[in-house]
UniProtKB/Swiss-Prot annotation:
CDD domains: Glycosyltransferase_GTB-type (cd01635). One of its GO terms (cellular component) is membrane. This is Lipid-A-disaccharide synthase. NCBIfam families: lpxB (TIGR00215). Condensation of UDP-2,3-diacylglucosamine and 2,3-diacylglucosamine-1-phosphate to form lipid A disaccharide, a precursor of lipid A, a phosphorylated glycolipid that anchors the lipopolysaccharide to the outer membrane of the cell. SUPFAM superfamilies: UDP-Glycosyltransferase/glycogen phosphorylase (SSF53756). The gene is lpxB. Belongs to the LpxB family.
Amino acid sequence: MAAQRPLTIALVAGETSGDILGAGLIRALKARVPNARFVGVAGPRMQAEGCEAWYEMEELAVMGIVEVLGRLRRLLHIRADLTRRFTELKPDVFVGIDAPDFNITLEGNLKKQGIKTIHYVSPSVWAWRQKRVFKIGRSTHMVLAFLPFEKAFYDKFNVPCRFIGHTMADAMPLDPDKNAARDVLGIPHDAHCLALLPGSRGAEVEMLSADFLKTAQLLRQRYPDLEVVVPLVNAKRREQFEKIKAEVAPDLAVHLLDGMAREAMIASDAALLASGTAALECMLAKCPMVVGYRMKPFTFWLAKRLVKTEYVSLPNLLAGRELVKELLQEECEPQKLAEALLPLLANGKTSHAMHDTFRELHQQIRCNADEQAANAVLELAQ
């Protein structure tokens, strides 16, 4: 480290989740090195922790091929400018937080200039496009991984990787209070409760909502007291879901929630959800679940050929077995979904065993990730 200046850490976050991770990392580093300097591309949370923003995070938060193409010149300009400015600054460590398409090339540029680089949050290289691991290995001095099987994957290719645990596991209690969550949502303590989470993307809500609603109708026949909670990520998804519900299940009483997915999961006896981060959050909420997923036939055909893992949901990948039922494509239909959910709503042996395994997995990935990430940065800065 340079003797004449404070520890200098450069960071680039490209979206809200990265801003949250960056803020936690900065906080943990400041506790150890109070005069450290932080610069780069930052969102409001990182800036509130004292990160100097050369560019606003929104500049990078572009999704979809059309949107990316429309902004490509600007994105390439920003990356070239950051390469130049970071090379002049010579930070002790550069941390690229997620945003792999932007950050991994930037990390490679900086590594060639002798700057130590970390990629924080592994892309899903273990699942598909596995050859990306070689570019990651060339571009970074270390990957910080949320999940233990990610580290095992990098170890196979001799790419330095540290398992730091998952920040979501740190944020959620090992034993959530179901009745307190029900009080917040107005659900009676003695009722059966099912959460429906048809995804955060428009295409998911379009493909899954009708089957999820029909499943709830079937389950209501078995459990007349069944409360159905549906947390939706924003007003757009809510409007989309309401339209589908009006056509498919106009008489089905449900609690529509703006956000509040975590409360809905904690309050529920079982959840039916699309795969993705929601499945991990549901596991941490100790809510037994069934994963239902459907996509366009060609997309599914392509995914089957590209994806290298046996399971799609994180709880199953963590457990290394089918802990939760995954019903995909033509299997994702109301009768089969309802059959898989019935034993979970019964709140008997099946759901208790699932709950206990969820708790064990939670403990495995609850490692104080912010502190672990800060340790990695400081060790590399030596």
